[in-house]
């Protein structure tokens, strides 16, 4: 279940599981969000077909912001994923701030366990999953995990 946002506008810290239908109902409340969710659904279908079982969603899409720029996502790296399929779907291309992903899906995808060095106010090496669990001020926030088996 997706918890209510805190007064800061962010989810409470933690990893909050949700089904796709709940996620869609919770966040689909403006035309821009609807557009982004359609792109996310297309990307998730590709990820699921490539063998990915879950993704983590973070960033401003999880806040009350009516028109977020994109949806920030990360997924678990696994050796048995269908790498050619992921590449063909632009889900491995992080060049130019994930330009191909943003153009095709309105989303950014990274490996959850990939390290980021000294990113923003967080002066340490952290993973994308850890990064998504901090706001721009470095304070803890929540993320949503979607099981891809819950897609309709």
State where each predicted segment sits.
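Catalytic core of pol beta-like nucleotidyltransferases
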Residues: 1-54, 62-68, 78-152
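Acidic active-site catalytic centers that drive phospho-/nucleotidyl reactions
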Residues: 70-72
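Short hydrophobic/aromatic beta-strand micro-patches
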Residues: 74-76
């Amino acid at each position: 279940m997706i918890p209510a946002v805190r007064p800061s506008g962010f989810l409470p810290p933690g990893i909050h599981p949700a089904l796709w239908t709940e996620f869609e109902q919770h966040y689909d409340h403006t035309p821009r969000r609807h557009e982004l969710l359609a792109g996310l659904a297309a990307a998730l279908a590709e990820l699921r077909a490539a063998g990915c079982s879950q993704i983590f969603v973070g960033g401003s899409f999880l806040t009350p912001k009516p028109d977020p720029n994109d949806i920030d996502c990360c997924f678990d790296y696994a050796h048995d994923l269908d790498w050619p399929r992921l590449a063909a779907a632009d889900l491995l291309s992080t060049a130019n701030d994930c330009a191909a992903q943003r153009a095709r899906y309105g989303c950014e995808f990274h490996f959850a366990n990939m390290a980021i060095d000294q990113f923003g106010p967080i002066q340490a090496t952290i993973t994308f999953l850890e990064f998504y669990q901090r706001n721009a001020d470095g304070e803890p926030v929540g993320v949503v995990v979607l099981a891809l088996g819950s897609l309709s």
